[in-house]
Amino acid sequence: MFLNSLKLKDFRNYKSLQVDFSNSINVLIGDNAQGKTNLLEAIYILSMARSHRDNNDRDLINWSSDFSDITGEVQSKMGKFPLEVRITRTGKKVFVNHLTENRLSDYIGNLHTVLFAPEDLDLVKGSPGVRRKFIDSEFGQMSANYLFNLLQYRSVLKNRNAYLKNIKWIGNNPKIDEDYLKVLNDQLIDFGSEIIFQRFVLVKELEKYSYQIHKAISRNEKLTIKYASFSGIDDQSTKEEISKIFNNQLLKNKTRELFLKSTSVGPHHDDLKFSINGKEVGSFASQGQQRTTALSVRLAEIEMMKYETGEYPILLLDDVLSELDGDRQTQLLNFIQDKVQTFLTTTSLSDVERDLIKDPKIYQVKGGTLVNG
């Protein structure tokens, strides 16, 4: 899979841009705050219909305009076709082959991307929310069914939390519509159990690829990745067993949730556990081991996406070479060479990096403009 070209209109600091890309490695060189990361962000939005770093779409629009437009030509096993994301002050629309897609689940999956940025260290040492965002973002690109269940679950969760928040109390007694709460619980269990079951399957697959890559670049250290959900659930559990335990947990925590006014159990509270030789990475590993783990997982993601979709994704490397030592730089660049279209940002390329990258297409980025370097 390749992104042949990109057009930006009033996106961040880009008033207008039209650029063609190499199917190999594209290097974006420039000082800080010139637009390198903005360009990677535009490609990510074209893939996922949302930013990886900003929750407010209005901030993506150039200050002098009322809308922003991102258009790209994708080349995949399905042929060539345009994707477009149009962002206004009041919302956004997405288009595939010039036709509006009303459902996000139908749009995502047309352009597969893997993003690797310095903050990916948070993947192993950050909060569980960072890791949930990672698996939802990547698994959602690989599986339309996973994405559908995830979006439905989030919708039901939002409705359930709103209901819990608005329950009126008379003294110590809440006035509950038990029938309505049961409908919400049943929907939450249905979609949530599917998510948990699929996460176990996909995390097991991710662990398989990560283990082999990590072993090769870490002198035979053994990396394990485990999905942590409800007590009593593991990767051998059936959907029926997961549903039963989920239901029991909701019943057990009912009083607590009425006081909290939010849903305290479910896959939106689950986590990933990374271990090297049996020791938890976030707590006991060195910074070098944490970086090797993050790198291994991202490279595994590329291979897993190839296996699941039949095509390599596009790789977005946002200023990560400066965060990696020479050995890890070599491992990364050798891995992607000649098989993955890559977009790499940096303030400068060292002589070593230039030797490692074969025939890169270099762009100089300055003030929202690109010039072939």
From Swiss-Prot:
Keyword Chloroplast: no
UniProt KW keywords: ATP-binding, Cytoplasm, DNA damage, DNA repair, DNA replication, DNA-binding, Nucleotide-binding, SOS response
Compartments where found: Cytoplasm
Signal peptide: none
Binding residues annotated for ATP, in chain numbering: 30-37
Protein's GO biological process: DNA replication; DNA synthesis involved in DNA repair; double-strand break repair; SOS response
Top-level taxon: Bacteria
Pfam family, one: SMC_N
Alphabetical list of NCBIfam families matching this protein: recf (TIGR00611)
Primary role: The RecF protein is involved in DNA metabolism; it is required for DNA replication and normal SOS inducibility. RecF binds preferentially to single-stranded, linear DNA. It also seems to bind ATP.
Protein name as it appears in the record: DNA replication and repair protein RecF
Originating species: Oenococcus oeni (strain ATCC BAA-331 / PSU-1)
Organism classification: Bacteria, Bacillati, Bacillota, Bacilli, Lactobacillales
The encoding gene: recF
